[in-house]
């Protein structure tokens, strides 16, 4: 059985890990980096770029470069947070037919899981290159505060990428796994404060030894799925735009190219200000007007940045307070504070956390890698490679149904350990009511309309009876991925209706299958492109070596031979400029054929003892050898 890899699918960066010799190892990508930007770009020639290559060209291709798409996953277009995002990103966010928030690039509308699948494919390929075998199974992490639709959409992204998602695991829980696996025996209670690129989570986790088993039990979790490093960047971008407007009277907000450069500069400045007291943002030729080009040059101090984001940092403290209250634990009883997510490198964030919990956070946990490592450990647990580890996670939000008067009646309270199953009996509101609609909700509000609607279904053919007499048993069942299955049963007739909750939007199975096929088609196109590039390289190498051979041969080549070879060289050069691999292969064969007699003639002359050619000369004259070496070298650098 192949390895089950662990993937941290982040808003800003993603990371992949695998368990080797009992230790979680982060795998470097093809560029040699341990994390990969979660950025996807659609180039003009149809090529799909993922990661660093997409990030590098973002400034020149802002409309077709998609970033922070995780913030849209499983969301409706009308949601306030989506409407806010539309004003901030240079790419288009559009309303899908089912009401979901989708994105548009290169004139094509796509679902967020499709975009995330491109990042997952890159992670999958990274793992396959390292392991030297096919990878088909993964554990993927999500923010603990993700609702059912968002979890389902993440699972869909895995399917589109060709992965069997064995488990969806919460990011703070994964970080605790990475931290706690090699800790001394005994009980610890830890706080995982996870402030990533787009989401914030806090979890209270108890790590205990139970009958020789390492038990990780989540006591409570809280968070905000629209608060992260991207918001910190945005504050800095707004400040730079305002400063430039004061100085030049020009508004950069309407210039996507300038905004993309500002985004890059703001992120860089924010990172620099974590280790230095001030930095310069210097962007020459940011825009131009009738008087000529304009340059942006703004000095920013750490104090200025802190004043811009103070309320964002403060916003993370209330969820910490609620999580402690829900867990029934005082801050003084926390043994360790673990910081996860790149944004926790900011000194102001670290100070706010240590002030609130009354202790310094641990420095031995890598905030960018811990989540992927924890996912890899969970993968090994599921594969049976790691024994004696038990993970008890919780449902982050209350689940219930809408009852008479527009009230939400809870069936499963928030912070209930999962997997879990709960049933409750309801009845009809009217006499002789023949059907009931089960409206499934997720959230903490008493008013049904104020909560997230996960879906509706009907239980029909209820025998006529006075109101309040029929007994309808509603069962909620949450699996280990935190995904909900709902059933309703008429106890009188035994008639039953069951559904796995797909958001009243979400992707249908047909749509997912189509996206899987599209992804496979892209993989096939990539393979063809690679083969074409290899054929072109082989053609170029043969042209070069043949020309060198003719030059070296001098008058040993007859005029007829020279003419025939030159014609074949020109034909091959023309073929190499085209996109037909078969044509290139045919011209390579043709040139090899017409140049072979000359090559043999020269080889025969060199082989005579009187000629005594040096061995390296002989190797250089052999056209075929040169072609092979060139071809291999080019392929290695791909």
Swiss-Prot record:
Q: Name one GO molecular function term.
A: ATP binding
Composition skew (Basic and acidic residues), residue ranges: 614-625
Task: Give the source's domain of life in one word.
Answer: Bacteria
- Listed InterPro entries: ATPase_NBD, Chaperone_DnaK, Heat_shock_70_CS, HSP70_C_sf, HSP70_peptide-bd_sf, Hsp_70_fam
The entry's keywords: ATP-binding, Chaperone, Nucleotide-binding, Phosphoprotein, Stress response
The modified positions for Phosphothreonine read: 199
Annotated region Disordered: the residues are 602-638
Q: What induces this protein's gene, according to its Swiss-Prot or TrEMBL record?
A: By stress conditions e.g. heat shock.
Q: Does the keyword Nucleotide-binding apply?
A: yes
- Composition-biased stretches, type Low complexity, lie in 604-613
Primary role: Acts as a chaperone.
Query: Which family would the database say this protein is a member of?
Result: Belongs to the heat shock protein 70 family.
What this protein is called in its record is Chaperone protein DnaK
Which gene produces this protein? dnaK
